[in-house]
Structures are given as C-alpha cells and as structure tokens.
Design a protein with these regions (language model features):
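N-terminal lobe of the biotin/lipoate ligase/transferase fold
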Residues: 1-85, 89, 107, 151-152, ...
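Short glycine- and Lys/Arg-enriched binding-loop motifs that mark or flank ligand-binding interfaces
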Residues: 35-40, 99, 121-123
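Acidic (Asp/Glu) carboxylate-rich active-site/surface patches
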Residues: 85-117, 127
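Conserved beta-strand-loop-short alpha-helix elements that form
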Residues: 122-131
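Cytochrome P450 core scaffold surrounding the K-helix E-X-X-R motif
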Residues: 131-140
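Structured alpha-helical
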Residues: 145
Length: 173
C-alpha cells in the first residue's frame, strides 16, 4: 500500500485532519504538520507541539474484528525499533502509550478508531521530540538531538516510520 502524504504548516490536530480525510473518501494516508494548535494525548490530555518536532497521523482501514486496544503496544514497538537505530541509551515503552529514553519521554502515540461507511479505520497519532523537549509538568522529557548529540533528519525518520507501518497495514486488512 502506498500511503498518500498530506502536508500542512499548522493544524488543530493531525488526528482530526485524518478523520476529515476519511470522511472525504480517503481510505489511507499520512497527515504531517509542523505545528498542532490542539494536539491531544491519552484521555484528552493536551499534547504540547513544539516547532521542529515531528507530528503526524497515519490512517487506514482495518478488519472490524481487530481489537484496536491491542495495537497500541505493537505500534509503540515499531517506533521503538526505529528509534533504537539512532539511540544507544535504554529505550523503554511506558504504558499506556509513551516511549522513554533514560526515563524521559521522547514519544507518545494516540490510537483512535472511526467507523465510516461501514468500514473501521484506525488513526494513529504520533509525536516525537526531535529538536526540543516540551515542559509537561512533572514528567521529564527529552529529544532525539539531545540523546544522540547530532541533528536527526525529521524527513528520513518519518519515511522510515511510514515504511514500517506500510508493511504492518497489510496484516491488518
């Protein structure tokens, strides 16, 4: 499957735009934005979207029988594996939906489902701190450039993740 990319400078939320695209008739795609004004995390928590970090949502049709709650960990494992190509430090999955490096959050995902035209869609919102570490209260954060001591290409990282999910999608149809 070839995921169509939709690129934006600023959106309310990449997951919201993905759901709009589904309602417009798109069956799959990737929403990419430089900035989110109302990004969200688990249980409606605000997702802080600092400029230069990576914010995107992948959406596609899945088999109606699949329990999407079981997909969160497998989605995190895909991201963790790709990040491990860049990071030498200990990377861990922190339930329910984060990835940490040295006990600091570097990534979060949000899985949402949408039933539309008798089809079940999965929308996976992904945020990865690449350049800056947002201040989110008592939860320490880090970023990819900080833990690698080098500049990481946002585009190359995004393309690796899209390729990995493109392979996974074939198993979920």
């Amino acid at each position: 499957m070839n995921l169509k990319k939709f690129k934006y400078k600023k959106v309310s939320s990449t997951n919201d735009i993905a759901m709009q695209k589904i309602r417009q008739g798109y069956k799959s795609g990737v929403i990419i934005s430089d900035k989110q004004t109302r990004g969200r995390g688990q249980h409606g928590k605000k997702w802080v979207s600092n400029k230069w970090n990576l914010f995107f949502s992948i959406f596609f049709i899945i088999n109606k029988k699949i329990q999407t709650s079981t997909l969160v960990i497998s989605n995190l494992r895909i991201i963790k594996k790709i990040l491990s190509n860049y990071i030498k430090s200990k990377i861990k999955i922190k339930r329910p939906n984060d990835i940490t490096v040295n006990k600091k959050k570097i990534c979060g995902i949000l899985n949402e489902t949408l039933f539309y035209n008798n089809l079940k869609f999965l929308v996976i919102g992904i945020g990865i701190n690449i350049v800056s570490s947002p201040n989110i209260g008592d939860y320490p954060t880090t970023n990819l450039n900080e833990v690698t001591n080098r500049r990481v290409s946002k585009t190359k990282l995004l393309n690796k993740i899209i390729k990995a999910f493109d392979i996974k999608i074939k198993w979920l149809l």
